[in-house]
Amino acid sequence: MWKADPMVFDVQVEVMLREGISDPQGATIERALPALGFGGVSDMAVGKNLRFQLEADSEDAARTQVQDMCDRFLANPVIEASRINLMPASA
């Protein structure tokens, strides 16, 4: 049985604290910026941005695999939410 070659995807995952979860890093940065002359900043949030390439048979398979990575390891689903951006890798 013939099987297509896997596709390569550029993956970007943004992991942020869920709404209502205290963000002490964000609060510290927000308080410090005015002292450095940067006023008008509010709602500062700190998170993680992960970028990698992934081989998968299809975009759906890649998205499912990345979501599983987020749920099991890359994010703490109790306090963090993840957003996945998936694109075919540039040659």
Regions found by a protein language model. Give the residues of each.
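Long, contiguous binding/interaction regions
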Residues: 1-49, 53-91
